[in-house]
């Protein structure tokens, strides 16, 4: 179980597959501890993929005396990449948090980044997104993890999928399980998300960028993702018309993989 001491903390990480280096990051959770499940199908066949636990998640440690910010989580990744000797990495940020980390890495260390993918992203929070994120955190704190889990799942999945898969989405082994009995980390992740603001710096990103818009996303809709496409010089944008906050189901996953690999293959 690799654990790296970087940026005054300890990060758990895994590397799957072979090929050009890539990093895959999600939202308030982790792609680790799943034998590569959850990653885009075929990604580890073509790329050497790094996944890691954000500080405070699972086996990564955190220092609560350091204020949480997207720049802090980006500095963790930068230090990990430097320790591994990785450069010219494809950064794949999905479902919120990972996008902000990728943006900050692309801004501060463009030498590390070969391309960047953002989906479920924002450059800064408006009142609507701020209140959503605050409400998720408040429900967790005041009512408990399982109420939060149900609440966030209702916002993140389409009704048809939720109705058919509620038994898998909810419960101890359900979604966002990394935050169960871990409110403090959730609080800090939300702090980082609320404070994230690259609106005035997007023009400085020189990395080839793809922004994927999820037309039915009730959290990070095209309202928050389109400004990133428009703000980064030369960025490409693709809309998935039938997708909510999380890509689910065979058809959506195939569509997502086609979009992702079409972009990565060009860079």
Language model region names:
Residues 207, 221-230:
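Short alpha-helix in the alpha/beta-hydrolase fold that links the catalytic acid
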Residues 216-220:
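Acidic catalytic loop of the alpha/beta-hydrolase fold
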Residues 5-62:
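Conserved HGGG/HGGXW glycine-rich cap/lid loop of the alpha/beta-hydrolase fold
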Residues 103-107, 114-143:
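Flexible "cap/lid" loop of the alpha/beta hydrolase fold
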Residues 205, 211-213:
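Short beta-strand/loop motif that positions the catalytic acidic residue
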Residues 50-92:
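Active-site loop/oxyanion-hole signature of alpha/beta-hydrolase fold enzymes
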Residues 235-267:
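Catalytic active-site module of serine/aspartate enzymes centered on a nucleophile-bearing elbow/loop
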Residues 127-129, 147-196, 200-201:
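Conserved alpha/beta-hydrolase catalytic His-Asp/Glu region
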